[in-house]
Amino acid sequence: LSNPDIDYIAFSILNIPLAYGCESNNPTQKYLSRLHFMNRLEDEGLFPALLGKRVHFLGMTEGPNEISLMRGFTDFIDTWDSSAAVWAGLNGIKFDSSPTGLSQGKFEKEVDFSYKVGDNIRLAKDNINYIEELCYAA
């Protein structure tokens, strides 16, 4: 963190669960892994070193409500990308009020970038609005 050549750090849905040995077959552990990682950074007193850096969250673990889990860390998270809102919506899945925001678990179908947008565009937009509301509440 003290290297001045590093100005952007990515926290992935792959590398953090992998570091904790919970990258597969354990959605609850995976869902909580980045929160656990952020808490460890805080406990180790590493956040002051992060203030001069930008942190990017790659993807979402098991649902959009992971955003709410990070509510205490918004000063450190610069950006967060995910196709979850659009991809779930286009496939007929609506984010919900369950603990993760996806009561049936993460939609695992690989994103098809040549997908033809059809009837579910409204649902995709609703999911985007759901995420925006989470972000503004954080």
Model-derived segments and their meaning:
Residues 11-13, 57-59, 84:
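A cross-domain feature marking catalytic cores of carbohydrate-active enzymes
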Residues 1-52:
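Conserved alpha/beta-domain cores
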Residues 39-55, 63-138:
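Alpha/beta catalytic cores of nucleotide-metabolism and tRNA/nucleoside-modifying enzymes
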